[in-house]
Design a protein with these regions (language model features):
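Compact, glycine-rich, soluble single-domain proteins
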Residues: 1-74
């Protein structure tokens, strides 16, 4: 089973293995530091579960469900 950002619990940290977000959004995520080998921490989930807030390289980023499920972790 592949672990994704969607599987993390608040406060949990993991290392990015890869992501399958394509197109312009994928490019923006890579530019913001979502690249292989970088640690990512799940800060919190919205009351209904999405979006999720992650902390990566010192800044916070909100991800939709589809994006969180597309980021695979080690």
């Amino acid at each position: 089973m592949v672990k994704t950002v969607d599987d993390l619990q608040p406060g949990e940290t993991a290392i990015i293995k890869k992501h399958s977000v394509s197109g312009t959004l994928g490019k923006h995520l890579r530019e913001m530091g979502l690249i292989n080998g970088i640690p990512v921490k799940l800060e919190r989930r919205a009351p209904l579960g999405y979006p999720v807030e992650i902390k990566i390289q010192g800044f916070s980023l909100a991800l939709r469900k589809e994006e969180a499920k597309a980021i695979e972790l080690e």
